[in-house]
């Protein structure tokens, strides 16, 4: 999927994610509320709205226990992005369930930590993007190049990609997060 929808907090629910998936992109449901029942309803609504693949984002900072992890496993989700925390906390449970896990990283240090944790890929988010930021404010294109020197994992470029020209210049990435 060349365009992967960002899991924007409080916005990226089943309506948006299904529209993206139906249009040929890859929709992702956000779970910032941490409310397992609400997230279950959003995941199940996706099956009414699309027959296309989609993923779920799990912000680690907001996970109080493994209930959300168990939910994505029970609902047979195949792709998860994690963010805002150490992916090592839940990576093995997710991967043991056959789920592909990409972790959002705003820095080289975060990327190296995620690689060591065993993620399947990275969502590389420069300072131009939303979400949790690196205080060093490294731009996307510099960040992509610096991370690519250290790993061959698939990378999704995220942040500030608004047209085809910028899409083209994100050539160090494998896909784009918009």
Where are these regions (language model features)?
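Short, hydrophobic alpha-helical packing/hinge segments within bilobed ligand-binding/sensory domains
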Residues: 17, 166-167
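Conserved acidic functional residues
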Residues: 104, 159, 175-177
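Active-site entrance/lid segments in N-terminal catalytic domains of soluble metabolic enzymes
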Residues: 1-156
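Single conserved hydrophobic/aromatic residue that forms the stacking wall/gate
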Residues: 168-178
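Glycine-rich adenosine-cofactor-binding loop
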Residues: 157-163, 170
């Amino acid at each position: 999927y060349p365009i992967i929808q960002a899991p924007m907090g409080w916005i990226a629910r089943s309506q948006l994610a299904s529209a993206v998936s139906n249009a040929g992109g890859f929709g992702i449901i956000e779970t910032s509320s941490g409310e397992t029942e609400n997230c279950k309803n959003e995941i199940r609504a996706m099956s009414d709205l699309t027959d296309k693949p989609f993923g779920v984002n799990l912000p680690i900072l907001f996970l109080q226990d493994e209930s959300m992890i168990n939910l994505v496993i029970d609902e047979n989700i195949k792709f998860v992005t994690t963010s805002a925390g150490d992916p090592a906390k839940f990576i093995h449970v997710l991967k043991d369930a056959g789920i592909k896990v990409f972790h959002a990283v705003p820095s080289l240090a975060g990327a190296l930590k995620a690689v060591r944790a065993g993620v399947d890929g990275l969502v590389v988010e420069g300072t131009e993007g939303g979400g949790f930021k690196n205080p060093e404010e490294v731009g996307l294109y510099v960040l992509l190049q610096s991370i690519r020197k250290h790993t061959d994992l698939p990378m999704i470029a995220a942040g500030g990609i608004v047209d085809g020209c910028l899409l083209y210049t994100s050539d160090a990435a494998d896909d784009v997060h918009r």
